[in-house]
Amino acid sequence: MPELPEVETSRRGIEPHLVGATILHAHIRNGRLRWPVSDEIYRLSDTPVLSVQRRAKYLLLELPDGWIIIHLGMSGSLRILSEAQPAEKHDHVDLVMSNGKILRYTDPRRFGAWLWTKELEGHNVLAHLGPEPLSDEFNGEYLQQKCAKRKTAIKPWLMDNKLVVGVGNIYASESLFAAGIHPDRLASSLSKEECDLLARVIKAVLLRSIEQGGTTLKDFLQSDGKPGYFAQELQVYGRKGEPCRVCGTPVVATKHAQRATFYCRHCQK
């Protein structure tokens, strides 16, 4: 599933081609996504794009009379095309722009979403979200406060959007490795120093992935059709049985809430 770095990479890739241009029309080939494509999107015509923003794993296209909310789901990606190209099986949505560009949404598993709202505030998919991990609000003090009475393992707690948004399976595993914290540790057992370190490394890991265009393991592509290259830098995720890059101990795989977790027994305590 695309996580925060992949969504932010998509935002940065499409923004220069959309902002200041006008949506001539939308071409919906298959509107049966996780939720049906909103009727308002079908009716788009001569609509300027004012901004392209991100909240958690949602892309937000600001229009004069409302917002398009895009979620990439499990396998979605957005590409900018310079000219019309024949659509393939999983190309479900096109936004045809006045500058000759086409924003194409591809989603083999159709777990993504294209929604419309007049106002962002209070929309159900954006309500009850925690802070952005790259914001000043997310820091060691905040993390310690939220972990203090939490009797659950730290790995699934990091993936809870009520705590912090956008830290999915890949980056939770990678951040815990970078901080030397075992994923099974109770959140409440983390010291102030460990919370400070973990908050810092989460930011560092996410920023490094954004610099590399995100992580492509299967479906994700950047807006220019290229894969993300952070997969080459993964320390533990997806490396079950391979030697730890630090100590050589085989990487272990386990599960938390049916999600794979990877860690090093020697480096993480």
Curated annotation (Swiss-Prot):
Binding site residues for DNA: 90, 109, 150
Gene Ontology terms: biological process: base-excision repair
Any Pfam family: Fapy_DNA_glyco
Swiss-Prot/TrEMBL keywords: DNA damage, DNA repair, DNA-binding, Glycosidase, Hydrolase, Lyase, Metal-binding, Multifunctional enzyme, Zinc, Zinc-finger
Domain of life assignment: Bacteria
Example GO molecular function: class I DNA-(apurinic or apyrimidinic site) endonuclease activity
Cofactor(s) annotated in UniProt: Zn(2+)
ZnF (FPG-type) residues: 235-269
Function: Involved in base excision repair of DNA damaged by oxidation or by mutagenic agents. Acts as a DNA glycosylase that recognizes and removes damaged bases. Has a preference for oxidized purines, such as 7,8-dihydro-8-oxoguanine (8-oxoG). Has AP (apurinic/apyrimidinic) lyase activity and introduces nicks in the DNA strand. Cleaves the DNA backbone by beta-delta elimination to generate a single-strand break at the site of the removed base with both 3'- and 5'-phosphates.
Family assignment from sequence similarity: Belongs to the FPG family.
Name the record gives this protein: Formamidopyrimidine-DNA glycosylase
Organism, as annotated: Salmonella arizonae (strain ATCC BAA-731 / CDC346-86 / RSK2980)
